[in-house]
Amino acid sequence: MDTRQAAQRWADVWERGWTEHDAAAITALYAEGALWQQHPFRDPEPGYLARVFAEEESSRCQFGTPIVDGDLAAVPWTAQTRLTDGGTQDLAGVSLVRFGPDGLVVEERDFCHEA
């Protein structure tokens, strides 16, 4: 699969999947054994999506156009979430995503800031 197509598919599925809390659709984008580091300077967290989606009442997000070089894409995104404890969270970030030849994610490193 072409990296540009894979990256756009990744962004589209994440945007819909985050809004709908569809962890299955999102995890289907990743190759078995893929590295996904959700926060810099922290170890990857198994079960991250399930934990985060359980803490969110609703979310709205937007993913930008991927910037692609070889098998790597950088994708900017923003999200506004309403948490189950009544709080809100506004995030702005970029995901650096490396794709395998089959178009599945083999490595992802996320960087974000809470506004």
Language-model regions: role of each:
Residues 1-2, 49-115:
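A beta-strand edge to alpha-helix "cap/lid" segment located at domain peripheries
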Residues 1-32:
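Short, low-complexity N-terminal intrinsically disordered segments enriched in polar/charged residues
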Residues 6-9, 44, 58, 72:
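Charged catalytic carboxylate motif
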Residues 10, 14, 18, 36, ...:
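Tryptophan-centered motif/residue detector
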Residues 24, 36, 58-59:
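A general structural signal for well-ordered secondary-structure junctions
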Residues 29-44:
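A short gly/proline-enriched turn/hairpin at secondary-structure junctions
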